[in-house]
Design a protein with these regions (language model features):
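Structural marker of alpha-solenoid helical repeat scaffolds
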Residues: 18, 52, 69, 86-90
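Canonical positions in the second alpha-helix
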Residues: 14-15, 48-49, 83
Length: 108
């Protein structure tokens, strides 16, 4: 399984060489890093997405989850709070709700 993960990461990195601003590829890469517990690398990819497209709402939720896994609760809270209006603006009330639930869990 780790081998497949490494292959996917390698493929995504190669694709990003042709278009480093492709947020969809970066998001996929970040998720692969998360699957492999490479959380710093995942967060780095999410931050690259925010620089290119601050309206990429799914990245806020996933980045917040990665930060929670690292124990960085305050930073995770910031990502969830920032992502809620982005998700709402794009019409994704389900994702906004997921981020609200994540915030509620952080408050417990």
């Amino acid at each position: 399984m780790v081998c497949l993960n490494a292959q996917r990461i390698e493929q995504l990195l190669k694709l990003l060489e042709t278009d480093g601003n492709d947020c969809f590829l970066r998001y996929g890469l970040a998720l692969e890093y998360m699957k492999g517990d490479q959380l710093d690398a995942a967060i780095e990819q999410f931050n690259a997405i925010f620089r290119v497209d601050p309206n990429y709402s799914a990245a806020y939720f996933a980045c917040g989850r990665a930060l929670v896994q690292q124990g960085k609760v305050a930073e995770a809270r910031e990502k969830f709070e920032a992502g809620i209006p982005v998700a709402e603006k794009s019409g994704d009330s389900h994702l906004a709700g997921q981020m609200r639930e994540a915030l509620d869990l952080l408050d417990q």
